[in-house]
Amino acid sequence: MTQTRIVPVILSGGSGTRLWPVSRESFPKQLWALVSDRTMIQETALRANGPAFAAPIVVCNQEHRFLIAEQLRNAGIVGARIVLEPVGRNSAPAIAAAAVLVAEEDPDAVLWMMAADAAIADVPALLTALDSAVVAARHGRIVTFGMRPTAPETGYGYIEQGPELAEAPGVHAVARFREKPDAAAAASFVADGRHLWNSGMFVFTARTLMEELDAHAPDVLPAVRLSVAERTADLDFIRLGVEAFSACPSISLDYAVAERTHRAAVVPADIGWSDVGSWSALWELGAKDAAGNVTLGDVVLESAENCYVRTDGQLTAVVGLKDTVLVVTEDAVLAMHRDMAQDVKKIVDRLKAAGRPEATAHKRVHRP
């Protein structure tokens, strides 16, 4: 049966350690409402919910399966297939499993791969860009979304765009992928107008992805095919074969395929995208008062400027601080300069090394 509708594939395997102490492995950031009154995974699923889309496939680890199923139901998402990874193997095996499942029905179906935890301000612009990406995907391209940079960000990878594709107006060949740059290189990328932030969203047909995995990462697909063949049904969940999936290399789709294939393309998009990868990113996204402060919860400020203050319970008062992040949870407090937001992971690593339960779990266990 030919699948004319786009199949959303939502990857929900991250732990979001840079948003500790709110995001932890047991309840990561995609399960929290951080930028709206819906959780991140609900917002992601709702962007791809309508007549143009098939029911989503969500790939996650088994510990989160009931929480994700409940959140999707509460958002009105019907018929989602939730695929359980027995172990984390990064994005290439995860999306390959979804592609193999879809290819059983229609190898030429178009898949839209996206992370569960990104924020997008302009959904209509996103869907317009998606239309262009689908045209290129149906011509055998692996299409990513490139975000026009608004600042010389060193925390993102960049894509250098090449010429526009004749068969897909608005979509460009990829000249090259670039690793996260230093500050000087990032500034030059922004200035030249040819470079885009790599969003990590991709559009391709199941057939194209599997062909490119075979060509560029031949260890991935055989193990994934076997794990899908050995799958079992568990309530509404799909459990992949443990031994076969565990044999997959741990590799991202960028490294496995996107940076190696000659079929890579990019659609430039101005959609207000953020990977919400740090507390400073949440400050940038948040509604600010006249002094540039973002507050959530029971917060009182005096002479504070450009701060992000969040409390999940107790009254939190801040006096005279600038450019500070203060996050208060039931069992942990994080205080830091906003410019150090990428270093939160170092704290989590130290807590793990010390055997502290706060590194990975909340004091209160969340049950659906």
Give residue ranges: language-model regions.
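Conserved core of the sugar-phosphate nucleotidyltransferase
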Residues: V123-A247, A265
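Alpha-helical scaffold segments in soluble metabolic enzymes
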Residues: R18, Q30, E43, R47, ...
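A short acidic, often aromatic-flanked loop/helix-cap motif at beta-alpha or helix-coil junctions
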Residues: G88-P93, A151-E153, A183-A185, W273-S274
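Short coil/turn connectors at secondary-structure junctions
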Residues: T4-I6, F53-A54, I77-G79, D106-A109, ...
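Left-handed beta-helix
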Residues: T2-R5, T208-P368
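Fold-independent oxyanion-binding glycine-rich loops
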Residues: G13, N61-Q62, P86, M114-A116, ...
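A residue-level structural signature of the nucleotidyltransferase/glycosyltransferase Rossmann-like core
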Residues: L111, R194, M201-F202, S274, ...
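Conserved N-terminal catalytic core of the sugar/cofactor nucleotidyltransferase
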Residues: M1-I10, T17-P28, A33-A125, D131, ...
